[in-house]
């Protein structure tokens, strides 16, 4: 990365550093992620998150390691309704696999970068299990489910600046150990902690569409469809499927966002959390973008957006004081709290006209539909004001407005006040759109 790119990325990431501080994230790590060579980088990035003041709970699984040990010992296990039936011999293998991963996670998190503090990593026995019992005539043996979670204990450990690590085996009130699905543990801990995010890893960079493109945003309804596809294709235990199952449930329970990333790509965790568009799939009932009326709190973001365009002569220069006076005229699109597009509606009630002014879209989004979204929002505001004609003055985007129904006009067609202040040095093109009421 060149120095300029590093500086640009660091500046862009700063709002997210502040946004995530003191938040609680639950991270799902299955056995495939832990076994991959990139896991050392994932743990380094987890350590970095902790150093930035993020509270972390790691819930890990061990399915592939259990399968390997069973095969090595010439043992097999059966499944019923996608759940492993665990007898006493199988449980010993499960303990061995889980214990090994537990040690790996602790040792990796203990590897410090130069001049970095020692991490406080703790193993939690906060989960109390109970047997699944007999279902449909099938005895699940030592396969269990959650009976209770000591959330207060986890909260105390997080308050003491610890990273909490929880595995997929847990004791019952009788002292027996049970094998639990790790996604169920992650789901319930995230819900009961009221975590801010659930984060999972798989072998691809999120959920892919039919053409192999990463879906950056996914609604729970769509997530259910992709989960069904995994199940119907016999991939119920695929990392992405298990994450979808967990994320759909936590989303319905009020966890605002879940993120699915690749465990193969170095830095995917940081890119997802500290960049505007991320790199994986975000699952949320709410869009990461919001279109709304601007307030005085948005003025710094508006200035950052329009200043480069003013310096290029594309927009007329506006002072901070002018923005403060006219802020109620502005409609903005924000993404993760960052203003990425704006437009103002200046009303001329006597002529039943209004101007769409100060139209700006962040360079990263100019090839998208944000301009159209702004135009529709401005038109809706104009309709409410009973505006009959919407006009724009532009030096660079004449064709864009013409493609959307605006017609070239002259200064004679402008409202009297606007006509008297028309800047003949800029010689902006005048375009008018008739609004049908």
From Swiss-Prot:
Pfam families: AA_kinase (PF00696), Acetyltransf_1 (PF00583). PROSITE patterns: GNAT. Pathway: Amino-acid biosynthesis; L-arginine biosynthesis; N(2)-acetyl-L-ornithine from L-glutamate: step 1/4. GO terms for cellular component: cytoplasm. It comes from the Bacteria. It catalyses: L-glutamate + acetyl-CoA = N-acetyl-L-glutamate + CoA + H(+). It is found in: Cytoplasm. Its EC number is 2.3.1.1. The keyword Electron transport does not apply. This is Amino-acid acetyltransferase. It comes from Actinobacillus pleuropneumoniae serotype 3 (strain JL03). The gene is argA.
């Amino acid at each position: 990365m060149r120095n300029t790119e590093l500086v640009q990325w660091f500046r862009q990431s700063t709002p997210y550093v502040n946004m995530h501080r003191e938040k609680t994230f639950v991270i799902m790590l299955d056995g495939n992620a832990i076994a991959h060579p990139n896991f050392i980088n994932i743990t380094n990035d987890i350590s970095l998150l902790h150093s930035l003041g993020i509270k972390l709970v790691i819930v890990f699984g061990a399915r592939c390691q259990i399968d390997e040990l069973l095969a090595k010992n010439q043992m097999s296990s059966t499944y019923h309704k996608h759940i492993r039936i665990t007898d006493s011999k199988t449980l010993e293998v499960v303990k061995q696999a889980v214990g090994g991963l537990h040690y790996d996670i602790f040792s990796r998190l203990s590897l410090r970068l130069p001049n970095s503090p020692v991490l406080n990593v703790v193993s939690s026995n906060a989960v109390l299990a109970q047997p699944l019992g007999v279902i449909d005539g099938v005895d699940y043996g030592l396969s269990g489910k959650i009976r209770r979670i000591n959330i207060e204990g986890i909260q105390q450990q997080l308050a003491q600046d610890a990273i909490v690590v929880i595995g997929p085996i847990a004791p019952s009130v009788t002292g027996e150990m049970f094998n639990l699905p790790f996604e169920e543990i992650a789901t319930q801990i995230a819900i009961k902690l009221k975590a801010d995010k659930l984060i999972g890893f798989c072998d691809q960079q999120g959920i892919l569409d039919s053409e192999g493109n990463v879906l950056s945003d996914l609604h729970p309804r769509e997530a259910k469809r992709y989960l069904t596809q995994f199940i119907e294709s016999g991939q119920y235990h695929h990392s992405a499927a298990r994450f979808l199952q967990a994320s759909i449930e936590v989303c319905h329970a009020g966890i605002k966002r879940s993120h699915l990333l690749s465990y193969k790509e170095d830095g995917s965790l940081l890119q997802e959390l500290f960049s505007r568009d991320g790199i994986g799939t975000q699952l949320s009932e709410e869009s990461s973008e919001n279109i709304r009326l601007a307030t005085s709190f948005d003025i710094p973001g508006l200035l950052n957006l329009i200043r480069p365009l003013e310096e290029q002569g594309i927009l007329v220069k506006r002072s901070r004081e002018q923005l403060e006076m006219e802020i109620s005229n502005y409609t903005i699109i924000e993404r993760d709290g960052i203003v990425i597009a704006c437009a103002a509606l200046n009303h001329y009630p006597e002529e039943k006209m209004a101007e769409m002014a100060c139209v700006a879209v962040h360079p990263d989004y100019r090839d998208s539909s944000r301009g159209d979204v702004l135009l529709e929002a401005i038109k809706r505001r104009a309709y409410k004001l009973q505006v009959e004609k919407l006009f724009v003055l532009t030096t660079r985007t004449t064709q864009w407005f013409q493609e959307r129904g605006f017609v070239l006009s002259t200064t004679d067609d402008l409202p009297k006040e606007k006509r008297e202040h028309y800047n003949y040095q800029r010689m902006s093109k005048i375009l008018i759109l008739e609004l049908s009421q």
